Each structure stands twice: as structure tokens, then as C-alpha cells.
């Protein structure tokens, strides 16, 4: 029993890992966000055909972030990345009022997938530095986020080029994974302390 409790505590305090899928319409800023988080700088990007994957270390959590291209022709491929996804980052170009309904349709289509039923949702309302950008409350309304009653979600205003808001979003994700692990480990600890006869 002592060895089992020792293993439990090492799991509680070990570095945690989280698989993140980052999607959104094309030109929303996904790749810029990924490399701002990874390198701390802006990199020149081209439209992503396929995916980029990087590991971002933050607050004792190793986030494996899959940035998948957003052009309409390759969106059907998004579903191939759903398996084992714990967190979904949906990036919205807050300045693109013409396509916010399209963004909503794509988001709702994804969230209906069984493989993503347990994934937490972080929405990055990106490009907040632009003068015509919709604020987080307006994006929340346009995407219909309040209708998501069975899912943990959060929206964060961001500016990928300056990095503003990105780490606040990662804070929310890290708290979500900590809470999930704590609930799971708490259940295991109760079972160890009070096993059924």
C-alpha cells in the first residue's frame, strides 16, 4: 500500500502533459500564436497546408499543440486529429465580421463529434489590436458559446503579434488539466484509503 501511495503522489506532482488541437478558419492567426508561444517571437508564416506541431512548456505542463490548417478545402481533415485531444483552442479573427458565422458553423460541427466530447474549449478572440475587432462578449454571442452547457469553455481576447492574452489562455487550460487530474487522483486516493470489501 505504501508503494501505491508513493506512486500516487509522484503522479500528482509530476510534469503533466496535455494534447491540444488548435483550429480555426484560415488567416485567424493560429500559426502566429503557436510560434509566439513556442519561441516568444513573431515568425513569418504562410498558409498552413497540413499541420504544425510543437511542444510548449508552461507551469509544469507540457502542451503538445497541433496547429491544423484552416482553408475550407482541408477542414474535413480536422477530424483526423481529434483522437486523444484534451483541449481545443479555436482561434477566431475578431476583425473578420463577414466570416464569424462560418466560424460558428465549423466550431459547432466539431463540438458535435464524439471524440471531442471531453475536450475543454478555449476560444482565442484574436487580432484585438485592429480597430474594427469584435470584443470577447460579441464573439461569445456570435459563436453561441452560452449554449454549450455540457462543456467547460473560456474565451480570451488575444493579439498574437504582441502575445497579449495568450498566456492567460494557457493559464485557464493548465487549471483545467490540474482540476481533471486532481479529481481523478482524488478518486483514486479515496479508493486506496477506503477500499470496498
Curated annotation (Swiss-Prot):
PROSITE patterns, per this entry?
ARF
Q: Where in the cell?
A: Golgi apparatus
Q: Name one GO biological process term.
A: intracellular protein transport
Recorded GO molecular functions are:
GTP binding; GTPase activity
The protein's matches in SMART domains, at most eight in alphabetical order, are given as:
ARF (SM00177), RAB (SM00175), SAR (SM00178)
What keywords were assigned to this record? ER-Golgi transport, Golgi apparatus, GTP-binding, Hydrolase, Lipoprotein, Myristate, Nucleotide-binding, Protein transport, Transport
- Lipidation (N-myristoyl glycine) occurs at 2
GO terms under cellular component: cytoplasm; Golgi apparatus
Q: Which residues bind GTP?
A: 24-31, 67-71, 126-129
Pfam families for the chain: Arf
InterPro entries on file: Arf1-5-like, P-loop_NTPase, Small_GTP-bd, Small_GTPase_ARF, Small_GTPase_ARF/SAR
Listed EC numbers: 3.6.5.2
- Primary localisation category: Golgi
**EC class:** hydrolase
Protein's job: GTP-binding protein involved in protein trafficking; may modulate vesicle budding and uncoating within the Golgi apparatus.
Q: What is this protein called?
A: ADP-ribosylation factor 1
**Organism, as annotated:** Solanum tuberosum
